Amino acid sequence: MNTIEISNELIQFIESSPSMFHSIKTIRTYLDEAGFTYLPESKAWDVKAGGKYYTIRNHSSLIAFKVGNDMDSYHFQMCASHSDSPTYKVKNVPELAGPNEYLRLDVEAYGGMIDNTWLDRPLTVAGRVLVRNGSKIESKLLYIDKDILIIPNVAIHFNREVNNGYKYNRQIDLCPMFSCGALKKGAFDKMVADELGVKAEDILGKDLFLVNRQKGLVWGLENEFVSSPKLDDLQCAFVSLKAFIEAENEKSVNVYCCFDNEEVGSNTKQGAMSTFLKDVLHRINAGLGKTEDEYYQAIAKTFLVSCDNAHALHPNHAEKTDAVNFVTMNGGIVIKESANQKYTTDAFSRALFTGVCQNVNVPVQSFANRSDVVGGSTLGNLSNTQVSVHAVDFGLAQLAMHSCFETAGVKDTEYAIVALKEFYETNVQIEEAESVCLEK
């Protein structure tokens, strides 16, 4: 498969994942087709050497694992990404009537997006809806496959400051227009009910989010770029999933994690700071008939690749990045490092993962923020509060992070799959952070 084919598959993966709930459904489809067995958290687990399994939490986070056949002295090799992206959530009472005959939606920010990128483009909604069905309450996925909303800008004639650093007020400026007389109040819930084939009065709860309807594409004179909504972080979710499914390792339990709520801090029951990963690893250990002490031995030898995209050198603002620790699109995978531990990378984990990449000739780039810029954190250092393991922060270089339409390099998607597959297939033997053997 060449870079264009991989990029087009990535675009399809993202288009089938308009919300975090749909992201997990898409990932489950890949796993089901690859022969994985679903293990509900609420049921007893039957875990065997050589088996392939996955479990989900809240239908928005997923952990999958492949058990090797030689589990005498085992450990975990893990990749973690996230299923969510910055957007706007529709409030429970969704409609704002007026002025005049306008009908608008009442929304609030989910995460730290670039607000103005959401204006003047066709939008829709996606997520989950909880519906009464007799004595049961059932969860249903919703995606309105139609252009139904726009957040209109104010004409420059009425807002002369729009090009002079105008600050958008999310309560006033960012309410999507739903109708101008054709629909009456109550139309939104009726639309949702009609789409699901239920009665509006049977809808008891909604987690619905705005979706950018713009299609992803490969572009450039030499087809060197891929642009799409949600590259952060579905590009990493995609590449780590492809590598995980393709790889085999007889002496490791390979683990794939895709957590929800990274964009709002991860401090939820299904986020990276939850007990989800710890719970799953303990249950794997128990299923293999191992003791508690053997579990802690395995954790001491475990390695995590925290997968979240990185900021590429900007063509118009090179001054925003460090003078030498900057990265470029199509330049290879990125290892991110931060002295204040916003990223998990240290010398040991950098050396280990660089060695893995060198084994398959994947170029490695180094990213650090400018010393006068406070960068964001991601999954690895947060999940380590629950499961403390050696970890590296990995990503792919992209532009316009947290825009509703982001840009990355086509080569890097392939680089990442190759590197992460090599990681999963390598028996990473860690000895107390003093040495590591990378054997296959």
Feature map (PLM): residue ranges:
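N-terminal hydrophobic/helix-forming segments and targeting peptides
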Residues: 1-440
